[in-house]
C-alpha cells in the first residue's frame, strides 16, 4: 500500500496503515487482514440496524448528559448518512469473523466516529474529534449491541418484507380459489387417483396453509422485540447508566415504528439467540408450505399434452436450448430451490443457536446472515411467483373433465348402496378391461344405468354446496 494513499491509525495493538480514502479505522483494517474468508459480507440490513442503534444510543447519551451535545449531534448526522446509503462501501467485513460481531461493531463505531469528526471540522484517524469507543460505543458492548441490531434487522425484514409478500400471494390464491369454486376435478392421494374435489377447494388448501404460516411467523415477533441492549458485557449492565436500556428501546421504537422493549432478562438475551432460532423455524415452516404449493402447481401444469395439464400457467420465457417451443414451470423451480436453501439455513441457525457458552452466544454473525438471507429469499421468491405465475393460473376445463370421467375412484359413491367389496370389484374389472365404471357396473348386474347416474355424480362428492 503506497504511503501516499494511507493514513496511520492506532488501536491497543499498535499502529496500522489504513487506506486514506476510507472512513474505517484500525480494527476494521485488522479484520480485513485476518479474516479474508469467502465472499459473504455482513448484510447491509444488519449494518443499518446497527447504525440505528448507535443513533438511538447517541440521543439517549446526550439526553442523560454522558455525551456532549455537539458530538452526539455529529454522530446522529453521520448515522443518517449511512442510513441513506451514502457509505455502503465502508462496511467490507466478512460474515466469517468473531462470533460476537465485535469487528463489525467496531467497523461501525470507526466509520461513525471518523465521519462525525469530519462533520465537526476535524480529521479522520488519531486526531479525530469523536472517539469510536468512548463516544459512539458509549454505554454499549458488542455483546449487547450486536444482538440488538440482529433483533432490529430481523423484525424489519419479517414485518416489512416477508409478511407483506406472504399476504399478497395469499390474497391472489384466495381470489383464484373463489374463481375456481365450481371446477370439479380428480383428487389425488399417494400420487394416485382419489375422490373428487373442486379446484377451488384445492387452491383453498394452499390459502389455509399460508394463513397458518403467517400466524406462526407473527407469533415469533414479541420475543424478537425484546432487546439485549443494556446488558453490556455479560448481562449485568456494567457501565450502562440507569434507565439507559429502557430509553434506547423507546428511541428505537420511535425511529422504526416497531414496539421494541428492553429484554426483561439480559442474561438470556446475550447468552442465547432463541428468538431468532424460533423466528427462523417459522420461516422454515413457510418455506415448506411454499415448496408444496409450487410443486403442486408444477405437477398440475405438467404437459402440455402428456402430463396432467389440469391448469395452465403463464409462459414467460423459452424453456429449452434444444427442444423448440418447450416452456417450463420456471417460477415453481426457482421457488422450490430457494425454499430448499431456507431449509438448509435453518440447520445452520439451529446449530448456531445451540452454540452459546456460558454468558455469550458466539455464532451471532452466522445466525444473522442466514436469517436475513432467508427473509430476502422468501420475500423475493413469493413476489416473483405471484407476479409471474400465480396471477395467471387458469383451469384447463376440457382436460379436467376428461381426467374426471376416466377416474375409477368415482366408484366410491357406490359404497353406501352396494358395499365396499362390490364397488372394488367394479373398479378392478373396469381397469382390467378398459371399460367405463358405468358399463362395468351394469354388466356385473350390480346397478341399473339409472341408479348409476343418480348415485355417481362427481359434483355431489365434493361437499360443495353452491
Curated annotation (Swiss-Prot):
Cellular component GO terms held in the UniProt record: cytoplasm
Active site (catalytic residues): 190, 320
Lyase as UniProt keyword: yes
Keywords: Cytoplasm, Lyase, Tricarboxylic acid cycle
Catalyzed reactions: (S)-malate = fumarate + H2O
Chief place of localization: cytoplasm
Superkingdom of origin: Bacteria
Marked site positions, Important for catalytic activity: 333
Pathway of action: Carbohydrate metabolism; tricarboxylic acid cycle; (S)-malate from fumarate: step 1/1
Molecular function per GO: fumarate hydratase activity
Bias-annotated ranges (Basic and acidic residues): 122-137
Region: Disordered, residue numbers: 122-143
Cited CDD domains: Fumarase_classII
Sequence positions that bind substrate: 100-102, 128, 131-134, 141-143, 189, 321, 326-328
Keyword Cytoplasm part of the UniProt annotation: yes
Cellular compartments annotated: Cytoplasm
GO biological-process terms attached to the record: fumarate metabolic process; malate metabolic process; tricarboxylic acid cycle
Entry EC no(s): 4.2.1.2
Function as written in the Swiss-Prot or TrEMBL entry: Involved in the TCA cycle. Catalyzes the stereospecific interconversion of fumarate to L-malate.
Misc remark: There are 2 substrate-binding sites: the catalytic A site, and the non-catalytic B site that may play a role in the transfer of substrate or product between the active site and the solvent. Alternatively, the B site may bind allosteric effectors.
Complex formation: Homotetramer.
Family: Belongs to the class-II fumarase/aspartase family. Fumarase subfamily.
Full protein name: Fumarate hydratase class II
Gene: fumC
